[in-house]
Swiss-Prot record:
It comes from the Bacteria. The lineage of its organism: Bacteria, Bacillati, Bacillota, Bacilli, Bacillales. It comes from Listeria innocua serovar 6a (strain ATCC BAA-680 / CLIP 11262). InterPro entries: Toxic_anion-R_TelA. This is Uncharacterized protein Lin2081. Belongs to the TelA family.
Length: 399
């Protein structure tokens, strides 16, 4: 019980971190679009290519309304606000990427592999050949103690069984941790989806504002400047053009952040699927392979004890035959018939070998899945580090 306490405390701490850092709604991510305390803002979208469909057209009606409201908050005269547009969502995505990276880094299933290797070693200690009693050689071994006695063999297998029980308990704990990790990853997946939706709204709002600037505001200002010939009117046209350019670049940065959320979704699922496959193999070992191995060993030991009893009975028969010659024939016949009856129904040792071989193959396949999972997580970790660096470079380019 004491071994589980640190794990439980760690899981509770993990849940608190998830609740505190990631328990935000889509409205929270959109509440402060420019990343400032005192001014409201909106989001942006790239409309530089007419052939590309507008993101706003792909949103739900609710999200479309949110994008429209955000676009109204974008003030063309506020050049400084563009720098912080969508920054809150990007900051949360940055923290989220750190959490994903930390989770992948600490996901070392090496101990699980060590436990399975230990289980294979214990199973290989169980030599089916020493359970194969064959004719007189077995009786010679048992009575002259050339090799292990039945009691010694039984004691050995009881010890191995106890060790396997401990290993099974460790595997059960490992399976529980894998499923808890999958639950945590599911929460991360949901938060990644929220960030994706928030970025969609920011980008869609930017699209709307750019469309308004390019199709309405700029033409009106140009017409006014041409009519008045006032230099200040021309400056307003230039200022609005510069604002649209900055807004367009900011939308592009948000699209890069959106791409991060798109890539993270399958990566999270990949880790979850690997954990699930490994947990299923562990479950198969605990619930099927280990009990089957125990049953077969128990049957083999029982049959070996029966053969020992037959051997003892035969010796008694031979001794009695010497003392009571008149009963020799009857005792000999009874001993032979008893031996035949006891020999009937013995399990073929080859079956036990095949069962053990199947168990070991199952464990080897489990190790293979664990190794593949480690390799996939290593690839995911490298990709996350690369994406984080790319995000930092993009944010630095904004400055």
């Amino acid at each position: 019980m004491t071994e589980n306490k640190p794990s439980e405390e760690t899981n509770e701490l993990k849940d608190l971190v998830v609740e505190k850092e990631f328990n935000q709604t889509l409205d929270d991510l959109l509440a402060n679009p420019f990343g400032s305390d005192g001014e409201s803002a909106a989001s942006i979208v790239n409309n530089e290519t007419d052939a590309a469909p507008r993101l706003v057209d792909m949103l739900t009606e609710t999200n479309k309304k949110q994008a429209l409201e955000l676009s109204k908050q974008i003030e063309p005269g506020n050049q400084a606000a563009i720098l912080g547009y969508g920054a809150p969502a990007q900051a949360k995505l940055h923290d989220f990427s750190h959490s994903m990276l930390a989770h992948v880094q600490k996901q070392d299933v090496g101990p699980i592999g060590d436990i399975i290797s230990d289980l294979m070693f214990r199973l290989q200690e169980a030599d089916p050949d020493e359970l194969a009693a064959r004719n007189k050689n077995v009786f010679t071994k048992m009575f002259h103690r050339v090799k292990q006695s039945i009691n010694e063999i039984t004691s050995k297998y009881q010890k191995i069984g106890t060790q396997i029980d401990r290993i099974a308990l460790k595997l059960e704990h490992s399976k529980k941790r894998l499923m808890e990790d999958n639950s945590f990853l599911e929460q991360l997946y949901d938060k990644n989806k929220d960030y994706f939706q928030a970025l969609n709204i920011y980008i869609a709002a930017g699209e709307l504002k750019l469309e308004e600037i390019n199709t309405k505001m700029l033409p009106e200002l140009r017409k006014k400047a041409e009519q008045t010939g006032d230099q200040m009117d021309y400056q307003e046209v230039n200022d609005l053009t510069q604002f649209a350019d900055r807004l367009d670049k900011r939308v592009y940065d948000l699209r890069l952040s959106r791409q991060i959320t798109i890539q993270q979704a399958p990566q999270i699922r990949l880790i979850q699927n690997t954990n699930q496959a490994l947990a299923e193999k562990i479950q198969s070992s605990i619930m099927t392979a280990i009990p089957l191995w125990k049953n077969q060993v128990a049957i083999a030991l029982t049959l070996l004890r029966q053969q020992q009893a037959v051997a003892a009975q035969r010796q008694v028969s031979e001794t009695t035959n010497e003392l009571l010659k008149r009963n020799a024939d009857m005792l000999k016949t009874n001993a032979i018939e008893t031996a035949r009856e006891n020999e009937r129904g013995i399990v073929d040792i080859e079956t036990l070998k095949e069962t053990q071989s199947s168990l070991i193959e199952t464990l080897q396949e489990t190790l293979k899945i664990q190794q593949e999972g480690r390799a996939k997580r290593a690839v995911a970790e490298k990709e996350l580090v690369t994406m984080e660096q790319e995000l930092k470079e993009r944010l630095l380019e904004m400055k």
